[in-house]
């Protein structure tokens, strides 16, 4: 059985992530969506909340061969522990490649038997990032085209509804 790991913070999971999971699920027998407990980024959602959002998203999109698991430590060690043949990474733009390439080389050095495979999302998801989605949500923008419904609802609860014009801006005369 060919099992792969798709790791990330998923704070929150977006339709871009779903797109990559869909591609991986078609190519491999099992996709483990690894939700990182430790991250250098400050997260909006706690690990348990991120896990729930990922699990509900996998169920909503009927990914019968994908599961979500939390993990700590090195991603490549987690992949080895799960007997994964590869780590899946999504590439949105050339700017992603340099960082992902360095990570892939380091992972290869640590565990040469674990490959890193890059998958590109569809054009309509290539610009998506969790950070942008959170910022748009904070500013009261419409995010339904970027995230699953369960995530949109969770963001509204977490961030709260804001006025469309929360700050009056005065212009110099």
UniProtKB/Swiss-Prot annotation:
Disulfide bonds: none annotated. Keywords: ATP-binding, Coenzyme A biosynthesis, Cytoplasm, Magnesium, Nucleotide-binding, Nucleotidyltransferase, Transferase. Its main location: cytoplasm. It holds the Pfam family CTP_transf_like. GO terms for biological process: coenzyme A biosynthetic process. Gene3D superfamilies: HUPs. The record marks 17 as: Transition state stabilizer. Pathway: Cofactor biosynthesis; coenzyme A biosynthesis; CoA from (R)-pantothenate: step 4/5. Its EC number is 2.7.7.3. It is found in: Cytoplasm. It catalyses: (R)-4'-phosphopantetheine + ATP + H(+) = 3'-dephospho-CoA + diphosphate. Substrate binds at residues 9, 41, 75, 89. One of its GO terms (molecular function) is pantetheine-phosphate adenylyltransferase activity. ATP binds at residues 9-10, 17, 90-92, 100, 125-131. GO terms for cellular component: cytoplasm. CDD domains: PPAT. Its cofactor is Mg(2+). The keyword ATP-binding applies. Belongs to the bacterial CoaD family. Homohexamer. NCBIfam families: coaD_prev_kdtB, cyt_tran_rel. Reversibly transfers an adenylyl group from ATP to 4'-phosphopantetheine, yielding dephospho-CoA (dPCoA) and pyrophosphate. This is Phosphopantetheine adenylyltransferase. It comes from Methylacidiphilum infernorum (isolate V4). The gene is coaD.
């Amino acid at each position: 059985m060919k099992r792969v790991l798709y790791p990330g913070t998923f704070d929150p999971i977006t339709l871009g992530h779903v797109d990559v999971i869909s591609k991986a699920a078609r190519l491999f027998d099992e996709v483990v969506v690894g939700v990182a407990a430790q991250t250098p980024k400050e997260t909006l959602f706690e690990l348990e909340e991120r896990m729930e959002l990922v699990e509900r998203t996998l169920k909503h999109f009927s990914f019968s061969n994908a599961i979500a698991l939390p993990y700590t430590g090195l991603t490549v060690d987690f992949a080895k522990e799960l007997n994964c043949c590869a780590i899946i990474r999504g590439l949105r733009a050339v700017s992603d490649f340099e960082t992902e390439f360095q990570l892939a080389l380091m992972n290869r050095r640590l565990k040469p038997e674990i490959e890193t495979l890059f998958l590109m999302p569809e054009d309509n998801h290539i610009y998506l990032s969790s950070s942008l989605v959170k910022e748009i949500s904070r500013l009261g923008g419409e995010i339904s085209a970027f995230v699953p419904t369960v995530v949109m609802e969770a963001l509204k609860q977490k961030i709260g509804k804001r006025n469309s014009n929360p700050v009056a801006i005065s212009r110099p005369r």
